[in-house]
Regions:
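Active-site core of bacterial EAL-family cyclic-dinucleotide phosphodiesterase domains
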Residues: 431-502, 601
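Cytosolic juxtamembrane amphipathic/interface segments immediately preceding
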Residues: 3-25, 61-62, 156-168, 319-322
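The catalytic core of metal-dependent phosphodiesterases that act on cyclic dinucleotides
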Residues: 558-632
């Protein structure tokens, strides 16, 4: 049963819809942070600062901050509709990916009946749930209809531009989908007699919470639903904005009225109560998660995420941590992500009921940092102390789950890398090498990450050369072969053919070849004082590297920087792909040979190069593929 449920969760997590939501939310991070900090700077709780904003350049600074908020976090439904649909189009691996955002936005506006005639802006954060549902559904339908339309050859115009044919093939799917959503939206508005039904996200949740009041049961349900939505990539806090207004929007006003009347405040729960004591650092008590990550994480990339996310989490902006780790769709982290705010709700409630902390009587913007917000909300330092206690409780809850998540992450990454090595080995055998960085490769996202890691490792000097001795028939040391080695911090050592393929597809193979040539020459200089006889040092290169116009000039320039007397360099060409011997290539190789550089052909016989190449007399050495000679001993034929 556990294996089956794990398989189901894995399939869901790797589905195109889940991947699109994760990627879309990640791409939206710059706009979320821009909007959050604009809100913080616009509403920072300081009278002197607010006076400055009002009077500076006639209020231009305040208006600018309002504008930045409106076009980013204030238009969150629009931002996520674009990023998620674009991610879906890229995941679908078609040339029509750019049309997905257009179709999704048009479908959403058609469903809403346009932007006019509504009580509120249809791209506000409160509309996120509705917008994401319409976006995903329109993308799924568009993809399926495109597949069906591609079979209709009559839609193809011979001789016309490629983009024209794509547009024509997309015409009917786009019209059908947008018109369909327009009809459904119109039917809903007609049946309910209100345009508000269009925002069915708020409508559904308002009905769910309709019979609940702002008591402990209601607040706990609100916290759980909020974080379940967050876990599935939906901005839960904004989606339930209408619910929070219904449950406890008025509670602080009630408390303030009671205080003015000389009575004790009675309303315990409010939005400020949650923002101040439960949502520390944002959803899921992100600040506790980040601190736990800094304390317990053994992975450098996770610690870096924590360091990057920490400054924004201090102002309760959690997106970097939640989407970067990630927590969403990470079922190992689902338990602490939901459990932590539930526990903090209970501890904060008990503290207030026991009189340890005053009841919240002042509204505080959610962007006000920890400690300051606790003090301002309660008017007492006890509020700040409760925040610290809750923060510690959250850290203790998160620690064991972070350990478990990192273990699973390591095993999954290692498994994918081993699969990439198997795909490369199979491709070398068949003559069809895998394209790791192509969208159609099943582990494309992992390969992209690995290519970036490889490039960064090269820039930091973390790539190494190991040397394999070559002995003569008499047992004397004839030479050494330089072998590329890189120990990835998660996957361990990775097969060199995979690294070369990633560097080639990533566009930095030539930079890598110069890096390795420099490294080999430095090692050769270090070796010179310890040898008396001549020694041949072989350095592997590929035919793809030789295709660069400046390869030979740059290689010769590097080699001539080092004074080598006993160590002779050999450029060993690996026969992993076909090499075209042109007159220009022969002249370039001859120039290096005249400078004392030898050439060797490795793995000859794999089937890529012709035996006629040996007649050109440009190779000083030919190494046969092991498969040609492995069966010679004992073979009577």
């Amino acid at each position: 049963m556990e294996s089956r449920s794990s398989s189901i969760m894995s399939r869901f997590r790797n589905s195109i819809s889940a991947q699109s939501i994760r990627s879309g939310l990640t791409m939206a991070i710059p706009f979320l942070i821009m909007g959050s900090f604009s809100l913080l700077l616009r509403n920072f709780p300081s009278d002197a600062y607010q006076a400055f904003l009002v009077h500076f350049l006639g209020g231009a600074a305040a208006e600018l901050l309002e504008t930045l908020y409106t076009v980013s976090l204030g238009s969150l439904a629009l931002v996520l509709s674009i990023t998620i649909s674009l991610s879906y189009g890229l995941q679908a691996k078609t040339d029509t990916f750019i049309l997905y955002p257009v179709v999704s936005i048009c479908s959403y506006l058609a469903f809403c009946g346009g932007m006019e005639g509504h009580d509120e802006y249809v791209f506000k954060a409160e509309w996120v749930f509705t917008a994401m549902c319409i976006t995903l559904l329109s993308c799924v339908l568009f993809r399926q209809l495109l597949k069906f339309g591609s079979r209709l050859r009559k839609l193809h115009t011979t001789g016309a531009e490629y983009l024209f044919n794509i547009s024509i093939q997309s015409l009917f799917p786009a019209v059908i989908i947008v018109a369909g959503f327009a009809v459904v939206g119109y039917a809903l508005r007609t049946a309910w007699g209100s345009s508000n039904i269009t925002n069915f996200g708020s409508y559904i949740f308002l009905n769910i919470f309709d019979r609940l009041s702002g008591n402990l049961a209601g607040i706990l349900l609100y916290v759980v639903v909020t974080h379940v939505l967050w876990f599935f990539g939906i901005h839960g806090t904004n989606t339930l904005e209408a619910v929070s207004q219904k449950l406890f929007e008025h509670n602080i006003s009630v408390n303030q009225s009671l205080l003015l009347a000389g009575s004790a405040p009675t309303e315990l729960f409010s939005k400020t109560f949650l923002d101040t004591f439960v949502f520390l650092g944002g959803c899921g008590c992100a600040l506790s998660f980040i601190i736990a990550l800094c304390i317990i994480s053994r992975k450098s990339h996770n610690r870096k995420i924590a360091y990057v996310a920490l400054p924004s989490a201090l102002f309760n902006i959690s997106e970097i941590a939640v989407f970067g780790f990630p927590i969403i769709f990470n079922f190992t982290m689902m338990i602490p992500f939901i459990l932590t705010p539930v526990v903090l709700t209970l501890t904060s409630t008990l503290a207030a009921q026991a009189g340890l902390v005053p009841v919240v009587t002042q509204s505080v913007e959610w962007t006000v940092p920890i400690l300051l917000s606790g003090y301002k909300a309660t008017g007492s330092v006890a509020g700040s102390i409760l925040q610290l206690v809750n923060l510690l409780i959250g850290v203790l809850i998160y620690i064991p789950f972070i350990k478990r998540s990192e273990q699973k992450e390591t095993l999954a990454f290692q498994k994918i890398v081993r699969r990439m090595e198997q795909d490369m080995a199979a491709g070398e055998g068949s003559g069809t090498l895998p394209h790791f960085l192509h969208h159609r490769y099943p582990y494309y996202s992992y390969a992209k990450t690995l290519a970036m890691d490889l490039s960064n490792a090269m820039q930091r000097g973390q790539l190494e050369l190991f040397y394999q001795p070559q002995l003569s028939s008499g047992g004397n040391l004839h030479g050494m072969e330089a072998l590329l080695r890189w120990k990835h911090p998660v996957a361990g050592y990775i097969a060199p053919p995979v690294l070369i393929a990633l560097a080639y597809e990533g566009g930095f193979l030539h930079e890598l070849s110069r890096y390795l040539l420099n490294l080999a020459c430095r090692d050769a200089v270090s070796l010179e004082p310890h040898i008396k006889n001549d020694l041949y040092l072989s350095i592997n290169i590929s035919s793809k590297q030789m295709e660069e116009n400046s390869f030979f000039d740059k290689s010769l320039d590097i080699i001539q920087r080092y004074k080598l007397e006993h160590v002779h360099l050999v450029l060993e060409i690996t026969e992993r792909s076909a090499m075209i011997i042109s007159d220009t290539l022969m002249r370039d190789m001859s120039r290096l040979k005249d400078s004392g550089i030898s050439f060797s052909l490795d793995d000859f016989g794999m089937g890529h190069n012709s035996i006629l190449y040996l007649q050109e007399r440009i190779f000083d050495e030919v190494k046969l593929d092991g498969k040609l000679v492995s069966q010679l001993p004992g073979n009577e034929r």
